[in-house]
Swiss-Prot record:
GO terms for molecular function: aminomethyltransferase activity; transaminase activity. This is Aminomethyltransferase. Pfam families: GCV_T, GCV_T_C. Keywords: Aminotransferase, Transferase. The glycine cleavage system is composed of four proteins: P, T, L and H. The glycine cleavage system catalyzes the degradation of glycine. GO terms for biological process: glycine decarboxylation via glycine cleavage system. Its EC number is 2.1.2.10. It is an enzyme of class 2 (transferase). NCBIfam families: gcvT, PRK00389.1.
Length: 362
């Protein structure tokens, strides 16, 4: 059996009461104090996530921008230095290799932050499709990454840095930022639906920054709450809302797919065809009317006919209702449409509802 991978924060987990699980080959905390309490901490105060398992891939060289334009669906030329952009990497079929964030450090240097379980696959795909004078390097082992999320994130982080955090706009970042005596990159971004920051630092210093932030009275947060938070905010999870068989258009990520950008990109032709023909299925929000929790891969029915599948589901800690995302036949995606979810050989009533399920007050 392959030994599970560990983040640089791993030695500290036990000290804070972490219960760990195998997550895509990594030994990561599913919870600390408990999923519900952790979820609430992020929605009302702040919480700290160890996300050092995420992959980082460095792209540098004079042709970096044109290479990424070819590789990714969004418009890379629109990114200013010191800004980040959400992106999708597609196969020729339009299916998804991964979703990721691109950080522009200079005109010739970018860092791509990718899903942990996809790092090796993404890197291989990027090398295979290399164009022009660029180098692509997997630098994942060099970085630790923490996410401080919640309405009080800025106030807390301000105690540990001299950087004017209020000047960092959403998806903006600052390099060489001192946090608790460690040189970091601070990005105003996250995966929770709340305000917050993702902080990158050398792996060896990750534990120091982790403990310095927790010492400010912040709760450590595990993967369980990370999932309920991102689901309420309707943020896609690769392997569930996106996959090699699910295109970004089907997943409702049109804002990150620039079919009109001049540059050709991998999957562009297939996605244009899909858009012109009209989507056969799309991602919608569902809320259960009867008791039961929708889970990944549960079937969705209408009048005994299977019309789709649940991609993600949970009991929403914020709303107190049982919610899910489902990829279903476009003909049945009107708001208010009643459907049924197959849960343990029973069909449980649900309805299609607006998304996101949760949106923070600005």
């Amino acid at each position: 059996m392959t030994e599970l991978l560990k983040t640089p924060i791993h030695p500290l987990y036990a000290k804070y009461g972490a219960k760990t699980i195998d997550f895509g080959g990594w030994d990561l905390p599913v919870q600390f104090a408990g999923i519900k309490a952790e979820h609430e901490a992020v929605r009302t105060d702040a919480g700290l996530f160890d996300v050092s398992h995420m992959g980082e891939i460095l792209v540098e060289g004079p042709d970096s921008t044109s290479y990424l334009q070819y590789l990714l669906t969004n418009d890379i030329e629109k990114i200013k230095i010191g800004k980040a952009q959400y992106n999708i990497m597609c196969y020729e079929t339009g299916g998804t290799v991964d979703d990721l964030v691109v950080y522009k450090k200079s005109e010739t240097e970018y860092i791509l932050v990718v899903n942990a379980a996809n790092t090796a696959k993404d890197f291989e795909w990027m090398v295979k499709n290399i164009q022009g004078d660029v180098s692509v390097t997997n630098v994942s082992s060099e970085y630790g990454q923490l996410a401080l999320q919640g309405p009080n994130a800025e106030k807390i982080l301000a105690k540990l840095t001299d950087v004017d955090l209020s000047s960092i706009s959403f998806f903006g970042f600052v390099e060489d930022a001192d946090v608790a005596g460690v040189k970091t990159i601070i990005s105003r971004s996250g995966y929770t639906g709340e305000d917050g920051f993702e902080i990158y630092m050398p792996s060896a210093d990750a534990g120091k920054v982790f403990e310095a932030i927790l010492a400010e009275g912040v709760a450590p947060i595990g993967l369980g709450a990370r999932d309920t938070l991102r689901l309420e905010a309707v943020l896609a999870l690769y392997g569930q809302e996106l996959s090699k068989d699910i295109t970004p258009l089907e997943a409702g990520l049109n804002f990150a797919v620039k079919l009109k950008k001049e540059a050709d990109f991998i999957g562009k032709e297939a996605l244009i065809k899909q858009k012109e023909a009209g989507l056969n299925r799309k991602l919608v929000g569902i809320e259960l009317i009867e008791r039961g929790i929708p889970r990944h891969d549960y079937p969705v029915f209408l009048n005994d006919e299977e019309i789709g599948i649940v991609t993600s589901g949970t009991q929403s800690p914020t709303l107190g209702t049982n919610i899910g995302l489902a990829l279903i036949d476009t003909a049945y995606t009107e708001l208010g449409q009643e459907v049924e979810v197959g849960i343990r050989n029973k069909k449980i009533k649900a309805k299609i509802v607006p998304t996101p399920f949760y949106k923070r007050a600005k």
